[in-house]
């Protein structure tokens, strides 16, 4: 077997022997019937149960998956895709370029690891991709006798629980992480949805592990909030001037009040001290200024239905379930004049960094991981392997154009679009904000250019995948914020799937009324063009329009069915069969046109990518460039920049900016090696800063994570225990030991009130002087009193209802465990803020945080025991 000519990395050559084994099995597998191939799954499962060695099954499992893929989808894994699968199975990240078939690659290790019957999770970034991949790739798994699950945002509890039981489950990062937190707040095992973790494949791993790593996932509960202070602070902020009353640190998104600013605010508010702990104004003021000076509408958030919705700066998508913390969200609400929602306190939280490390086996795939490989390896212990492309890369990355100011840059982009549009070459323009995307859209309108707009606005988000999929159509111009539509392939000449569904939807809705039937041939000439099938198409359409069940469908019902048609393997209703036939006929026709359009666009140079600003990370820039040149297609990319871009403004050296100002003419761009190197250096500085921030978060959260794991482990044991008698007795005995230790402390007053308060009764034997009692005798006596009190309480509950005491014990332990953990999280958050300042005193903040967090955790355990035993002994039945 010859080696793949594109494999240059000697590290990948280690997989060649396995590739040879997989290919050698192909001929024999092709001779098997479908049933015989399916039975291979049960044979491999049996072998695994006997040998417990998954590595021994790798070659055969991969070969079986490839054959099943070819029989169900007509897709045969390339050798480089086999390498990608082997890399994933070895617990690494596969970097595969756009269009190289990452979704198909994941089926190889997923099938192999599903043979253990321990479950496989394939994690994607949104519900659409999870559903799409489960529908398409699920055909392979079902063919091989495996069941697949799908978790969606609006899924009910029982359905969610059932889908997690599948051998392979498709789910979003958001859903699986929040399900984990909710499971660890459950009051009984029947409320738990997740099985034990086994193997996880993360798609778009850089988006989840890096872009979203700094945002912890939080389940919160509302707390009383002083709404009026946010409103007043927002009004005060309007009277303050930048660089006079406050300074803006744009790099770190921070605000620093000047002495003049502090005095001015105290004068306006008529208070003596903004920092007064009894009536603090400073947090409200700082949040209000941040909301005004650092957070902008249609850039960092949008206003929708009288709510502030955050816009993800990396993807351009809205995040309706996220809120800024520390009062910032309320400050933005006050600024925009929308209803201010209550502050919240954390009931449970985890970062993606620590959540995904819970999986015993973890891997990921993306098109852009190499630039962040150090972070992947240091934090997640995930090496990155760059997988060669199946075909040579023909994309041309042209040098950046840099202009003097933003106006000149945007004008140049519009002119470039006008020039390219004349050739009919498709254009995809990536912008960094909603505001910029809409401004460019208005500019293109002035140039009389038609375009499709995709940004975080709700009316655009609904059509995200469709808009991105059609970005490769002849003559199309698509404006998209950052990486919106990620995961959707842009096919040169257009994507027939979306196009055909839209066409059929329009046909069905238009002709549902019988009065239109006489005009069928003239209004819909496309059907006549379908040569020998056109008459049959019209005949089926005519019968469909006379089907009462179809006519009862609303327009929304038709659209819903068309979107879900892939999930219906064998339609059982007549109108469904008819619609599926019409869709197939249209697809055949459109595929012929698409083949022609594909060749035309390739001859024009493929998709032309225009970047409107360098992002803070080279990885994000590469993601935009990677939208063109898929699977050996031609493509071109160029970035248009200005000296007013945030990267230049915040991280470019003053020497560079002065040089550029002198070199640049008003409306002409500049290309230079110095410029490129300077931009790369600026991006590297930002990447290092952002990495330090994520590493800082990880180091601190890792300490909390160890405590979280202990609490969740103990909590699960509580749920699984049939009886908690031993736990209650152990807690009670430890409480007594704690009290005796206190009583023996010379500084502690010698009184029996603490003991009597615990037992809620007067203990006769303690009337004598406590100093005269021996510790052992006192402990023995109190133990006996506690055991007696416990048995009395058990009897009291059992008389009322058999088994009631067991339920009560579980409830009270879980209640205090959860309350104490919630309070612990608040204290940890305050501690993290406080220790940061200690570096100024030449102390190590991380070391001190670790030490004090440990003490807080120990105190939490003591508090749980004392409160629990006290309330248990004081409890009574109403």
Curated annotation (Swiss-Prot):
GO cellular component, as recorded: chloroplast stroma; chloroplast thylakoid membrane
SUPFAM superfamilies: Helical scaffold and wing domains of SecA, P-loop containing nucleoside triphosphate hydrolases, Pre-protein crosslinking domain of SecA
Protein EC: 7.4.2.8
Keywords: ATP-binding, Chloroplast, Membrane, Nucleotide-binding, Plastid, Protein transport, Thylakoid, Translocase, Translocation, Transport
Catalytically driven reaction(s): ATP + H2O + cellular proteinSide 1 = ADP + phosphate + cellular proteinSide 2
MF-aspect GO terms: ATP binding; protein-exporting ATPase activity
Entry's localization field: Plastid, Chloroplast stroma; Plastid, Chloroplast thylakoid membrane
Coiled coil: none
Major subcellular site: plastid
PANTHER family for this protein: CHLOROPLAST PROTEIN-TRANSPORTING ATPASE, SECA INNER MEMBRANE COMPONENT OF SEC PROTEIN SECRETION SYSTEM
Protein name (record): Protein translocase subunit SecA
UniProt source species: Thalassiosira pseudonana (Marine diatom)
Gene that encodes the chain: secA
